[in-house]
Structures are given as C-alpha cells and as structure tokens.
Amino acid sequence: MRIGLVELLLILLIASLTIGPSAALWVDRWMRRAQKTSAAAARRRAVQEAQRAAEREEVLQRFQKLSIVFVLCAAVALIWGLVLRPIEAAPTPYTAPDVRQETGAQNAAEGGVLELAPYTEISALRENNGWLYAAAKSGKNGCLLRMQPDGTGRTEVLTTAGEITDFAFAPDGTIWMTTLESEGGRLYRVNSDQWGVTVELTVSQIDGRALSCPTAVAAASDGAVYFTDLAAARARHGVESALRTELTAHTGTGSVYVYDPAARTVETVLTGIAGASGLALDEAAETLYVSDLGSRCVWAVDTAARDRTAGGKGCSTHLYGLPGYPGALALDADGTLYISYRWARSGWLEDHAGRTLLRGMALRLSQTMQEGLFSLSASDIRAEAVAPASGSWQRTIPGGSSGSTTALCPVGSRVYLAISGETKLHWVRV
C-alpha cells in the first residue's frame, strides 16, 4: 500500500501527540538534572576557589610576618655590626692635617724588579756591607733573606714564627728584629757565628703590657735600640690590618721606646703618635725621625729625649701635609731621608675626621671592605726623598703599580721598594 503525503503527515502528527509529551518531559528532566549537576560543580569550584584564596591569604600573611621579622632581625644585626659591636680601638675626633702644595721635585728614573718568589709579603729592607736584606713570609713563618743588590746569591739567614715587621744592624753586626706573633709584639737580638744563628728575646712587655705591634727598629752605635709600637690596640690580623685600624680610629696611642741592652731597661722616648709606622736614626744630627701615619707627618725628636709627646716640647713636626700616609723611613749615606707612603690621602676619612660614628662604622666593616677605603694607585706618589737639613724635596717616586708601600731601602744609586701583595722588589734610579 502506498502512503501519500497526507497519510505521512497524519502518522507524524499522531506520533507526536502520543510520544511528544513523554519525550518533552524526559528532556526537561534531563535538562534540570544537568543544570543541578552544573550548579553543584560550580558550588564545589567556588568552595575550592574560596579555600585556595584563604590558603593564599594565610600564606601571604605568614610571609609578610616572616618578612617583617627578617627585616627587623637584619636591622638589629646591622645596627649591632656597624654601631654597637665592641671594637678594640674606639675612634676619637681629630683635626685633619693640611694638604701640602706641590714640591716640584723631579721624578726618579725608571729601574727594574727583582723576583723573590716563592717568598711573599715583603715587610722590611736593609743594606749592610754591600748585601741587601729583606724580611718576607715563607709559608706561615717569617724569613730573613740576604742577596746581592742584583738579586743573585740569595740565601735564608733565619726563619721565625709570626711576621718580621722590621730589623736593623748594629755596628757590631748584631741584628735587632721586631716581630708580630700570636702572643703580641716582640723585640729580638740576633747573633751569628761559625756555630750558626742565635735568636734572643729581649722585650715582649712594657710595664706589664704586651707590645701590640712594633713596626720599626733602629740601632745606634752606643748600643741603644729604638723601636716603635704602632698603637695600644692589639694587632690580631697582621700589620696591614693594624695600620688601617689606627688610621681610621686615630687613637694617638703610638709610641717610640729605647732599649738599653747593658741595663736591660726600656724607656719611653715619644708618645701620642697616631700610628708609629716608621723610624729612621740620624746619628750625626742626633735625631730620630718618626712616621705619624694618621697625622700625615714626620716628627723629629732628639735621641737623648725621654717622655716627650708628639707635637709638644722637644718634638717638632719636621715634615707635614704629606700627600699620603707615611710608613717606612730610611736614610742614605748622604743623609737624605726617604719617606714611603702606605696609602694616598683619603678624602672620605679626613672629611669625617670629627665624626666618630661613621669612622666607628668603618672600623666594624670586614677586612675586605676596609681595604676599599684606602688605596695607592699607579698615579699616586709612592715615596719621596728630602734633605732634612734644608727641607728641600729631592726626588719623587711615582706609584707604578697599585698596592701599599711596605718597605724601602736606598742602596747606592738605587732605591728598592716593596709593595703589598707582590713577590718582587721594585727599584728606581736616583
């Protein structure tokens, strides 16, 4: 039987009237169920999101609290480290010295170098009977070397514990040597004969107080031995660190003493020095020249003087307003005085000469950071030569390389210089 269009439409109408309501009801129920499921999922997501937001807020609050605690602890540590932490040398206010005008002295002619490796930290130089002597470090020990001025024939004279800070020859060949050891400073007498070298401790304390840091020594023909003590504060990290400490603190507690080997007594020659860093003895003029590190000057005092104060009666400022902080001193055969400079003048330090708080903070910095406060560049003056009688400047020795000047020694037409951190000696022609 054929179904026409009318019949087909009637069948579809009857089917829709019969099945349609049930299908519509089923679709409606399915849609409602889907909507409920979606709403429940949305509510669960909302709850989870709220929980996550609450957790984030709690973590953030904890982090903020920890950050505040950390900042407070860091601030307390910083205040303690830079302001409240005890230091051995409390800074004192002082008046910064003037700056000297240009002298017009000629530059020394270029020379050369002598390599001393494996020896390091050359701290003192002397000439005796045509030989050049040098104090250096060999491992952890101090070592005294002897060589020809051209570096040949190098031998070890002796080794000792600690750091040899300076040495001097007496007319009878005795070597007087100052050292810095773990127990403090020492003054030794060194004798040598066919049996070898003997080292005798002569001074380790003065009036019951241990030597802090003897930095220079000079021996007179009458047997008297003059030596310096850098400052009252103990040097725990070597001479270089002790010099920076006194330069920053400017305690003015450095001294010069004289030891009488016959009587075994020690007398005070000069006090009130802001870093007694160098010493030279002119026996013809009966004068001691003393480097004052912090005051940028050289004092002159009679060898017979006792209990004098720097700048007081019987102690005049022989050279002042120097371009750097003076260290080792030396006299040549003609009486010319050579002055070495540890560092160039620090504008920051002297601008804050009267401000103990900032200088106290600088004293509490690490050793590496303190080293950045002072420098001597290749363009600065490393050493100078002056005629003490007339005060006329003879020669200027330029920096050449960076690093503080630790020692110098005139030998004939040459001047030898040692620079911190190097294993070689520099020399120039004068």
For each predicted feature, which ranges?
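Hydrophobic single transmembrane helices highlighted by the model
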Residues: 1-22
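Intrinsic disorder/low-complexity segments enriched in polar/small residues
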Residues: 8, 49-50, 65, 149, ...
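Sequence-structural signature of mature extracellular/luminal beta-sheet repeat domains
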Residues: 80-430
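Short, Lys/Arg-rich N-terminal segment immediately upstream of the first membrane anchor
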Residues: 1, 53-62, 133
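N-terminal intrinsically disordered, acidic low-complexity segments at the extreme N-terminus
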Residues: 30-51
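Internal/C-terminal transmembrane anchor helices
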Residues: 60-83
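Cytosolic-side junction of a single-pass transmembrane alpha-helix
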Residues: 16-35
